Amino acid sequence: MDDDQQFCLRWNNHQSTLISVFDTLLENETLVDCTLAAEGKFLKAHKVVLSACSPYFATLLQEQYDKHPIFILKDVKYQELRAMMDYMYRGEVNISQDQLAALLKAAESLQIKGLSDNRTGGGVAPKPESSGHHRGGKLSGAYTLEQTKRARLATGGAMDTSGDVSGSREGSSSPSRRRRKVRRRSMENDAHDNSNSSVLQAAASNQSILQQTGAGLAVSALVTTQLSSGPAAGTSSQASSTQQQQPLTSTNVTKKTESAKLTSSTAAPASGASASAAVQQAHLHQQQAQTTSDAINTENVQAQSQGGAQGVQGDDEDIDEGSAVGGPNSATGPNPASASASAVHAGVVVKQLASVVDKSSSNHKHKIKDNSVSSVGSEMVIEPKAEYDDDAHDENVEDLTLDEEDMTMEELDQTAGTSQGGEGSSQTYATWQHDRSQDELGLMAQDAQQRDPQDVSTNQTVVLPHYSIYHYYSNIYYLLSHTTIYEADRTVSVSCPGKLNCLPQRNDLQETKSVTVLYTIHFFLYILMIYIFVLCKILPRIVFVWVST
């Protein structure tokens, strides 16, 4: 019996040990028996691992009898192939989100278990991994694919209770946390939008309710004023009609405002609302009457509109009588006769106003014509002044020019200068002429300063005769303040008149001659240099040719 006793030896870390061994064998490329190629790069693997993880590789390797076959994978990137190899050898892989779709597609084509529908192993749901490591060293934004059955069971997929795991993928993968966050944000935004829309709708409804209540209050106020007016409304309307009927003058306006105030005061005990309305209408009519009366009663029309004003006053008296006759009727209620009379009088007032305006315009035109005629007449009647009349002063004017022409040069020399006679007079005359030249220079400067401003312009150029300006200032302030002028070894300072550009009067002819002489000299020197250069270049050749001949 002791020989039949058996002992069960269990390796607790069997799977992890095998996985680690396969990983080390793959890294060291030990005992590899096949090669996978993608994008010109190669990965060596073990047939056993490939057959265990993919039915596609299992059938493919069964038909191959070579010791070391090479499989070229089309439409698969090397990075995706490397990730699938890590997944098959270790059971998990870390990959970025943008590469997840391409990896799943390649796994579907190669029928990798756990990544495709045609698998016999457990399904895997992509789960974000906060702490993990892989061969590439990418830690952030990575997803872990684990070969477990718990994720599929959690998603609601029906799994067989028996040990058979050769079913197709059941259920759907759980969404990622980012998608859940996006959905939560969208739901919060929708709730916020709904709350905002509800608030806006409530505000709009409140505003419409307020508008409706305001309109109802206004209508009720109008109804109450109309009901409470009674006979006082007739008096107020009568007062307003009479206010519009009478002509627009300042005295009539004051009278009518007083009458409107009296009617409003009498109607106040009847109803306060009608009285206030009548007073407001009276004030409005008063303002309109004042503006129109100010526009009509101008200074140009006052003297010529007296006759028309008298006629208007006569019409006013007639209208006042008619209103006095119709007064009792208006107090009791509306009178059709008074209404027709007011309409007729309104037409009369309009006609009178039109006539007054026409008269004012015609008078203004006449005044303009009179002014033009008077101006023409004044231009025609212009006469020379008495100071220009030669006939009036012929008797008192003495002609001295004839006497100076008759006098000889000797007499002029004797008479010129001071009152002293003899030799001293001639000496003083010479000095007087020298001083006279200086005085002429000063007078010319003063005349330039006091010149008529009409002749002064920024574009004018003044040339002072017989002077040469050697110092020219670029700043206009210094140019206007001081300019140095040299003449006959004498320096004289004058100020330039008003904004004028003082330019010297030079002897341009001499300067042009000197310039032309200089240019001709330079030209001949240049030609001489060219001639010498040509001789130096050509003369040796000529001598050589002559010697050779």
From Swiss-Prot:
Keywords assigned by UniProt, alphabetized: Developmental protein, Differentiation, Neurogenesis, Nucleus, Transcription, Transcription regulation
Name of the protein: Longitudinals lacking protein, isoforms H/M/V
Annotated tissue distribution: Mostly neuronal.
Primary residence: nucleus
GO CC annotations, alphabetized: nucleoplasm; nucleus
GO terms (BP aspect): axon guidance; axon midline choice point recognition; axonogenesis; dendrite morphogenesis; gonad development; larval lymph gland hemopoiesis; larval somatic muscle development; nurse cell apoptotic process
Function: Putative transcription factor required for axon growth and guidance in the central and peripheral nervous systems. Repels CNS axons away from the midline by promoting the expression of the midline repellent sli and its receptor robo.
Subcellular location field: Nucleus
A Pfam family annotated for this UniProt entry: BTB
Domain BTB: 32-97
Entry coiled-coil feature ranges: none
SMART domains hit by this protein: BTB
Biased composition (Low complexity): 162-175, 228-251, 263-293, 329-340
Region annotated Disordered, chain positions: 115-200, 228-340
GO molecular function: DNA-binding transcription factor activity
